Amino acid sequence: SGVSQGTREAMNMNKKEVTEIKKLFTKERCCLNRLCGCYVDADKNKVVQFKEAFLSLPEEEIYKYLDIFRKSLSGTLGKNLLNMEFPLEQEMGDGTQKSLLALRDSELKDDVMLDAFYDRMIETYYHPENYLILLVHGSYDIPMKTSDGMEMDDASDYIYNFVLCCLCPVTLSKAGLCYNAETNSIEDRIRDWMVDLPEQGFLFPAFQDRNTDIHRLLYYSKNANELCPDITEQLLGCVQPIPAGQQKESFQAIIEDTLGEECVYDVVRNIHENLNEMIEEQKENGEPLELDKMQVRKLLERSGAPEANLEQFEKQYDEEIGAQMTVMANNISDTRKFEVKTPQMTVKVSPEQAGLVETRMIDGVPCLVIPLTDEVEVNGIHVHLRDEEVLKNLE
């Protein structure tokens, strides 16, 4: 079997590829061979370091570690799971990508290299409490697939060698009483330092097009809105994408500032509907929809934004997001609801029915008009609508 390195062509790990690697973190399909770790206290001291042949660990421990590793590949692509690319300068000389490649190629057997990695992590990562740095090395003999997607376990062209890093908080278990079977009594429970599921992690190299991509990695953050630039930018040397929540705020600001007085209900509703349509079309590819500056401009244009207002768009986009940065469509649009809000009320409509809600001037007052069917509930009580009531309210 050979090893492919991937190209610099812009491609990201998709959901299927993440799932394929995640399935390796089970006892039945496990291809992990070496585990290393460093327990760090709140004062940044190394308390203990360890290295083990992964499959020689007690079975219960193996299952606990596999839970941690699976967690670091969970969540939503573009939110908790972020595809990150190394800038070209990090692939040369003493660049971060070079040092990660050396770490992977050592199969975590070089103590000097491991120490250097732990030192860099401790120096750059800010965590106010105790935490555990976990590193695991694996070798996946990638099975070939038939044209109908069936795996051929006995046929393989490439081996995917990788390292997975997880940063797990270590916290004191809760105080309380417990039953002691030896003394047959209820007593104060001894509090233990427990390893929690990871808050940050990364998989290197990326697994793209069912192969190795040394130009990228997959980053995990438990909280999609609190990424860790200490790790992503300083330790890994990658360009950190804008957090999911901030992408939505920036997109909303771009629309409001670009459209100005033309930021009317119909245009905003069209943007929402067109965006959801694009997301649905992209679902077939198994990869989340990513929009660059020109694609966002086309979206506004298609949704009825006046040409005169779009002259301001590029400036607004560059200021809010960045000329070369992209946004994930799922981060800027909620495909599950369409919401209209005023200080007095909130109206939520399923996105498919958004076209039913209109704005009209009635007796000189701007109103929101929603057609009613015969299925109307008020505080859970089914009510009947008389024709004269409906007509009277519309007059």
Regions found by a protein language model. Give the residues of each.
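Extended alpha-helical interaction scaffolds
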Residues: 14-17
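Short, Lys/Arg-enriched N-terminal segments with co-localized hydrophobic residues
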Residues: 1-12
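C-terminal, beta-strand-rich globular interaction domains
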Residues: 301-395
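Long, hydrophobic alpha/beta structural blocks
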Residues: 27-29, 33-334
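Short N-terminal leader segment in a subset of presequences, especially plant chloroplast
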Residues: 19-28
